[in-house]
Design a protein with these regions (language model features):
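Short linker/helix segments within small regulatory modules
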Residues: 57-64, 86-87
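Hydrophobic beta-strand positions
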Residues: 33, 73-74
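N-terminal pre-ligand scaffold of iron-sulfur
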Residues: 1-60, 92-106
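C-terminal structural segments of small proteins and small subunits
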Residues: 74-94, 99-103
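Short cysteine clusters
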Residues: 47, 67-70
């Protein structure tokens, strides 16, 4: 268990290809780690939909994801729903880079 506020090492920059997403598990919680042209981003690991689909299985286009379970679209950067504003936003988390390493800041 890490101390509160201490960044959690995800991996190395080269571990995640641009335009892709990987699941990252920490303390029994899943996070979706995205590498976009504009940098690294992180959201909760599962969609809020009934299927609770892994967001690491989502389709990515630019800075948006489409849930593989429900088909809803969200901004990866803000977590806001795009095609249905009534939906609950995704939780987003800060990701930092240092010397070729990626860190999740909870």
């Amino acid at each position: 268990m890490n101390e509160e506020g201490e960044p959690i090492h995800i991996g190395e920059v080269e571990d995640i290809d641009k335009g892709s997403v990987e699941n990252f598990e920490h303390e029994e919680m899943d996070y979706a780690i995205f590498r976009l042209e504009s940098g690294f981003f992180a959201t909760q690991g599962h969609c809020n939909c009934r299927e609770q689909a892994f967001l690491s299985e989502a389709s990515i286009e630019d800075e948006e994801l489409e849930c593989a379970g429900c088909g809803n679209t969200y901004s990866i950067v803000s977590g806001y729903p795009i095609n249905d504003e009534e939906l609950q936003s995704l939780k987003i988390y800060d990701v930092s880079e240092d010397d070729g390493n990626i860190y999740l800041n909870l």
